[in-house]
Amino acid sequence: MALIEAFLLQGSPTGTILGALLLFLVIYLFSSSSSSQDKEKYPPGPKPLPLLGNLHILDLKKTYLSLLELSKKYGPIYTVYLGPKKVVILSGYKIVKEALVNLSEEFGDRDISPIFHDFNRGYGIAFSNGENWREMRRFALSTLRDFGMGRKRSEELIIEEIKYVKEEFEKFGGNPFETKLPLALAISNIIASIVFSVRFEYSNTKLHRMVGRAYENMKLTGSPSVQIYNMFPWLRPIVANRNQIVKNLRDTFKQNEELINGVMKTLDPFNPRGIVDSFLIRQQKDEESGKTDSLYNSNNLYCTVNNLFGAGTDTTVTTLRWGLLLMAKYPEIQAKVQDEIERVIGGRQPVVEDRKNLPYTDAVIHEIQRFADISPIGAPRQTTCDVHLNGYFIKKGTPVFPLLVSVLRDENEWETPDSFNPKHFLNKQGQFVKKDAFMPFGAGRRVCIGESLARMELFLFFTSLLQYFRFTPPPGVSEDDLDLTPVVGFTLNPKPHQLCAVKRS
C-alpha cells in the first residue's frame, strides 16, 4: 500500500498510523451517507475505497505518471480521490486550455493544500485567493514592471551575474562538477537584487543557507509522506518531512526579517530600490491614512517575498540544469547551437535582442522546457462556481489538477512527444514557431507572474554559457550513460550528476 510504504520510508511509527487509520475508517463508515446528487453528472473515475480513496492505485513517488496513466482509461476529464479528497484531473491540451484559458474565471482559484497553508496562511501571491490574491498579484506585477522585469534593467542584472557564473565554472578547469550550486547562487542573486536591492558574494554563508533550505523544501514538498499529510492533515505530528519544511521556512522568514530590517533603515520613500522598498512605502502610506484593513501588512510582505524567491529560483535553475545536461547528452545539437551563436553574435555578450536572429537556439531552449516538463501536474486550481466542462458537471470548490505533462507530451500536438527534438519549434524553412500547446508557465489568470523574467534568464544564461563553454560528460562516461530519469519533488529535477565545462577557443 502506498500509504503504509510512504511512512515506512520515513521511519514513522507505523503502529500508530495504522491504528489512527483504522479508527478514522470506522468513523468514516459510520458517518458516511449516500449523496443526494446525481453522480452521473460528474466525471468518471476509479472506484474509491472508504477514507483511502484511490491511494491503492497511485504511486506516490511518481504521482504525475499514475494520473497520466489513469487518463488513458477514463479520458481527458476524470475524478480521483486522494484519500477522502475528491479531485478532478484534466488531461490533454484541448481540455486544459478550455479550462485554464477559455474558462479562466471559473477555474481561477488556487486549491491550497495543508502544506501550502502551513507556508502562507492565505497570505502572499502563490497560495491565496480572493481580494488578497488580486491585490498582491497586482502589486507584484506593477512593481516588477517598474523595476524593469523583462526589460533593459533586468537584462543588465542578468548579464552582470552571468560574468560571475562563468568565473565559477572556469575555476573547475574543465574537470567534472555539479552545476546546481553556482546556478542556484546566480539566480538567487538576481531575485535578491530585484526584491531586496542587494547582491551576495558566492562565498556568503547566508546565501548558501537560503539556497539550501529552498532546495530541500522543494524536494520534501513532493515526497510521499507530505502528499499523505495533505490528504490526512491530522497526521501532522508524525510527518517528519512536513515538520522539517516548517522549520526551514521559519529560518528563512527570520533571515528575510533581517534583510527587510536592513532595507527599512535606508528606506527613501521617494526612491524605491526594489520590491520590498515599494511594499514598505505603500504600507507606510496606508498607516498614515489610518487605513485599518490594509492588505499591505507584514504577513503579506513575508509571504510575497518567499513566494517570489520560491517561484523565481528553483524553476529557472532546474531548467538550466536540464538544458546543460541535454547539451552534453546530445553534442550534435550543442554544436548546432554554438555554430549559430558564432555566426550571428560572434564573441560579444549575447543580449535579448539577439533572440529573433537565433531561431535554432530559441527552438532548443523551448524544447528543453517542454521535454524537462519540470512541473508536470501544474499548480492545483479550484473552481469558483458550478461549471460544466466537456459535458461534465464540476461543483464549486472542487480541486482541479491540470496535468501539464499531458499538454507538453500530447501526441496530437507534438510529432515526437517523448523525444528531445528542437524541430518541434521550427518550420520547414528553419524559422522559429511557437506552439499553443507550449505551457510550461501555466495558463490563464494564474499564469506565472515571472514568465518574462524567467524567459530572459533562460535565454541569456543558456546562450552565454554555450558561447563560452562546451559541456561534456565526465571522463569515462559516455553520452548514452547520462541518465535523463528525473528526481521527483515539487518539481522534476535531473538526477545528481557532474559535467565538464570546457572553455572554447
Curated annotation (Swiss-Prot):
Q: What does the record say about its membrane topology? A: Single-pass membrane protein
One GO-annotated biological process of the protein? aflatoxin metabolic process
Q: Which cofactor does it need?
A: heme
Can you tell me where the transmembrane regions are?
Answer: 7-27
Which Pfam families is this protein grouped with?
A: p450
For this record, an example GO cellular component is: cytoplasm
Where does the UniProt annotation locate this protein? Endoplasmic reticulum membrane; Microsome membrane
Q: What is its main location?
A: endoplasmic reticulum
* Keywords annotated in UniProt: Endoplasmic reticulum, Heme, Iron, Membrane, Metal-binding, Microsome, Monooxygenase, Oxidoreductase, Transmembrane, Transmembrane helix
List, alphabetically, the InterPro entries matched. Cyt_P450, Cyt_P450_CS, Cyt_P450_E_grp-I, Cyt_P450_sf, Cytochrome_P450_fam2
Q: Which Gene3D superfamilies match?
A: Cytochrome P450
Q: What does this protein do?
A: Metabolizes aflatoxin B1 (AFB1) to the cytotoxic derivative AFB1 exo-8,9-epoxide. Does not show activity towards lauric acid.
Instruction: Give the family, as the similarity comment puts it.
Output: Belongs to the cytochrome P450 family.
Instruction: Write the protein's name.
Output: Cytochrome P450 2K6
